[in-house]
Swiss-Prot record:
This is Uncharacterized mitochondrial protein AtMg00850. It is found in: Mitochondrion. It comes from Arabidopsis thaliana. Residues 83-107 are annotated as: Disordered. Coiled coil: none annotated. It comes from the Eukaryota.
Amino acid sequence: MKTCLRCRKDYPQNVAGNMLSTLRKEQNQLTSVLTGIHILRRTRLKNWLGEMLEARIIQPSISPYSSPVLLVQKKDGGWPTARGLPSLLQAHGTRQVPNSRDRGTVG
């Protein structure tokens, strides 16, 4: 069932997987609360995101259709190139999202 949630009070208090979403009504922007992350890692993540914003590696979006991107720092301390879903699908030559379970790995 599709539901259009127009303001914060319409959101359920507990969503499956403990991911709480909020709608910033004034900006029409969906955001996800960082849950399940230790407070020290959360602080580091916020600092890294702040640094990447300042360096213009990433940019904020107020589009209701934007997708979140997860960046994982490489072992050498660098950051991978973030690619959008269309270019990822084109690189794999498929219209389906690649899945780690398809390769027989645990994920």
